[in-house]
């Protein structure tokens, strides 16, 4: 008897820089290494190449749309993909894709899990409704105890469905001995680093709560010469870039 090869579909807004994107790629590799079929559905991005290296199949679809008037059309296209791929499990990794994809789990009788990567804030009624879709999964993955606490504070009735799965880190990616000197020199020249000055680096996507402004404020109190590199701060958010420039 031939053992069935299960197909897992991960759906996220895009494949650009971020923890969600990195997690999807790493989960995809783990799935394929364990004889699962991995498909990923997103609107694309510069991490597509990394995803394909895992052996996953990528479908490009506008699942990042926050326009409810477009969801039905996108949902119809997504339904075709899920049926053609005989998907056994859907993993919804963000709110907009969840609003599009969750109803299909019910229609096609496919189990759905959701994952929560950000804090839920009690802002207003409509925001709570928008956030609530991530609590509809058969299982809710929280990436930390802090996130679990945040979910329970906003949606106390879903506590039994939450599973905390902490983010892993591939230490080989951050091992300096694995980086060739020529690459280090090339990147230093590209950034414009000066020799013999200490380098302070912050690597993060552009977001107010990531701590950029705290770092800039702290560095303003340092009297010694240094170089500060903000990796990722210019990733498309021009309004945020302008705020940083004004602060500096």
Residue ranges, per PLM feature:
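A short helix/loop element that forms part of the nucleotide-sugar donor recognition site in Leloir-type
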Residues: 175-193, 243-246
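Carbohydrate-associated surface elements
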Residues: 146, 168
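A conserved mid-protein helix/loop that constitutes part of the nucleotide-sugar donor-binding site
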Residues: 18-29, 198, 202, 207-221
């Amino acid at each position: 008897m031939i053992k069935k090869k299960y197909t897992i579909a991960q759906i996220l807004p895009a494949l650009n820089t971020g923890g969600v994107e990195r997690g999807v790629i790493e989960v995809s590799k783990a799935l394929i290494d364990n004889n699962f079929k991995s498909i990923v559905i997103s609107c694309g991005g510069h991490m597509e190449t990394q995803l394909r290296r895992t052996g996953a199949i990528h479908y490009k679809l506008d699942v990042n749309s926050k326009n409810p008037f477009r969801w039905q059309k996108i949902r119809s296209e997504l339904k075709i993909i899920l049926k053609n791929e005989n998907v056994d499990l859907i993993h919804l990794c963000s709110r907009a894709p969840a609003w599009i994809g969750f109803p299909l789990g019910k229609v096609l009788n496919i189990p759905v899990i959701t994952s929560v990567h950000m804090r839920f804030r009690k802002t207003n009624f409509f925001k709570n409704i928008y956030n609530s879709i991530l609590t509809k999964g058969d299982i809710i993955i929280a990436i930390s105890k802090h996130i679990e606490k945040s979910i329970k504070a906003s949606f106390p009735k879903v506590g039994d469905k939450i599973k905390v799965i902490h983010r892993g880190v591939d230490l080989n990616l951050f091992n300096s001995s694995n980086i060739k000197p020529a690459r280090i020199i090339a990147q230093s020249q590209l950034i414009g680093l000066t020799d013999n000055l200490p380098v302070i680096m912050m690597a993060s996507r552009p977001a107010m709560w990531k701590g950029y402004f705290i770092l800039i404020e702290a560095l303003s109190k340092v009297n010694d010469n240094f170089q500060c590199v903000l990796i990722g701060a210019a990733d498309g958010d021009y309004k945020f870039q302008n705020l940083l420039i004004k602060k500096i």
